[in-house]
């Protein structure tokens, strides 16, 4: 009898050993074990419990630090990158994306095989074999041996067969997602996406873990593991962007007085969960202007005082949500009994059949219940003085002396409103204002009237776009204009005037020289003692003209001055 007990104990032990040796999903995918409450209340649609058995024969399990990881991929290690569009409003879908990054010079081709990139050299140099992994050939060999596409190794770790959708043989990576005590298996290529509905997910941060396997003949080899934290919230994720026309830096939340600020509300809703919801925006700008309620996601507001203000925004949306439990049916009214009767009836009270209450039959749960969800945003805004406006009131062409240079100088007379600028910048571009040709910035010293002249150089004639900016520590004010610079041809009015002045000057100098020469000759060949006074006075002008004629026309006169003297004597 004692031997029989030993034999039965041995059989029980032998039967128990395979159960103890078999791994489960939670043993492979993570050490964090959710509580029984979380397992019960976080049921994800299409996911399975991690209490299921893991097929370790097809999908070997390697711990971190195992030396086999170094040889899991030819040419290096594969890195998996896990991202999500978290945070997610409870009830909406959250999407996870996994992308595989291969070693240098490797990529996935159109057939799902891993090949070397052309003309790419890695540490091992150029490879004669174009394939890193030729899974197409492996798949054909496997089908040839089995004679059918239904193979015992085309299954997931829990034994479920691969879905045979078109092109499934080109998908050679197996992704196992694990969160909240549940797992999801997916066959894919070098990148996959998985969406999860968060209606039953506990609020707060949660952990998603992913293990990636690759084909290896008739089995699979782990190549990467990755994890990431995602957040499920009952608050609408809200972001607000603020923009002001002349604000120098919108990220510092410092803005200008007397200029409108545009507030734009961005709701993080990548799954479009709130597309059919009515959304209300309630604003409090903190400047005693009261509350402003709108259904538009953009609003403008102008602060008229300097200082610091607290901005508050509340977003309200009616979103699909769980229906509240029906209220308990009202008890039928009865005459008020005595205390002893009450105690007796309480002890013997038993619930009656549900059909006795006609109200219970009409209480059918509404499947389209809605619940109000709220989102909040707060910011502290500083309002300061700034340059509000800038205008170009006059443009003047600066006249240059001869020789005329190739460039032109233009003076811009500029006025501004608001604070006093400390610098001026001009950007000279083509007529479309897209191709910048020149940028000049310089400090300025402006009086309280804010009137200044900016001189800029233009290289050559043509039409230019001029952007002129006045700035200080907190603001930038911009104005633009188109200017046409004329061609500087030699026949310009100023050039002609200068040429005329030069010609007149040269003529005056020439006449002066001739007059001096004539005067010198007249003094040398007109003896005073031999000429009577009356003749000199009456004939002086004739003599002067004759002598000038002799100088200009020497061929028609006698060359001997003695003959001239004799002639004048004969006349007298």
Curated annotation (Swiss-Prot):
Motif (Cell attachment site): 64-66
Entry's Gene Ontology molecular function annotations: chemoattractant activity; heparin binding; integrin binding; receptor ligand activity; syndecan binding
Residue intervals annotated with topology Extracellular: 23-498
Biased composition (Pro residues): 321-335
Location of Phosphoserine modifications: 542
Example of a GO biological process term: negative regulation of cytokine production
Topological type in the membrane: Single-pass type I membrane protein
Sequence intervals crossing the membrane: 499-519
Disease implication from the record: Increased expression levels in glioblastoma multiforme biopsy samples correlate with poor patient survival prognosis. Has been proposed as a potential target for antibodies coupled to cytotoxic drugs in the context of cancer immunotherapy, including that of melanoma.
Family the entry assigns: Belongs to the PMEL/NMB family.
Protein name stated in the entry: Transmembrane glycoprotein NMB
Source organism (scientific name): Homo sapiens
